[in-house]
A protein has these predicted regions:
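Nucleic acid-machinery interaction/catalytic patches
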Residues: 1-233
């Protein structure tokens, strides 16, 4: 079972296909922006907007703060209330809508940004009413409304993870609390002992979700001297 299959097994919602999701998003975009954009003109940007909504939900961001009335990246100087992850999401969203090529969407970016919170909220409500979702929405719903009675296995084994999204970390916490999860982490002590950014996250995960495998030798491959033999052609 993949992590995606696990989430889907714990939710009554179904992940809809991309075309359905973008077409539904277009309705809410048109309603709140009063734009005369056609679906053809919107579709590419709709996929981008959907991708950003997906990232926001998988990182469990506060959409009202992230989609506040912010018209310029320089306003970051005064948004100390945002977490680093939220600032990163916001920065990426601005960059995605930046560029040399002009389009009605880009020219009206400021007005679009100021209604994104309404689009996001209304869109998700409409999807939920149809019993469907995009992947990040479903993941977030499972993480925020975890119900252990929906678990179908006695134990879940998570192997090979090294960087978690917020929704994954929340699910791991819930399963660990129910004593229904064991973990096999993918890491090397080289990253742990050299102030590497990857090591920082793994250290936190190992503390929260102890590794099932003991022993240090299997986690020190990058610190050993390699013996490489070159074969001639």
């Amino acid at each position: 079972m993949t992590i995606s299959e696990l989430y889907r097994s714990l939710s009554p919602l179904l992940v809809a296909d991309q075309i359905k999701l973008v077409c539904e998003l277009f309705k809410h975009y048109s309603h709140f922006t009063k734009s005369q954009e056609t679906l053809d003109d919107f579709y590419g940007w709709g996929e981008l907007m959907l991708s950003d909504f997906d990232d926001l939900d998988k990182n469990m961001g506060d959409y009202e703060k992230i989609f506040a009335n912010t018209n310029d990246l320089h306003d970051f100087d005064s948004v100390d209330f945002l977490t680093e992850e939220q600032k990163e999401l916001l920065t990426r969203f601005f960059k995605n809508f930046d560029g040399d090529h002009k389009s009605p969407l880009k020219e009206n970016f400021a007005s679009l940004w100021n209604v994104l919170a309404s689009i996001y909220s209304s869109y998700r409500e409409a999807l939920r009413g149809e019993g469907i979702a995009y992947e990040g929405m479903l993941y977030r719903d499972v993480a925020e409304h975890f119900d252990p009675t929906g678990l179908k296995a006695k134990m879940y084994v998570f192997a090979g993870f090294n960087l978690l999204q917020k929704v994954e970390q929340r699910l791991f916490e819930e399963l660990a609390r129910e004593k229904k999860a064991i973990f096999y982490w993918d890491y090397d002590s080289y990253y742990m002992n050299n102030g590497n950014e990857a090591g920082k996250y793994i250290s936190a995960y190992l503390h929260a979700f102890p590794n099932q495998l003991a022993g240090k030798d299997i986690y020190s491959n990058l610190t050993k001297k390699e013996n490489i033999t070159f074969l001639s052609a």
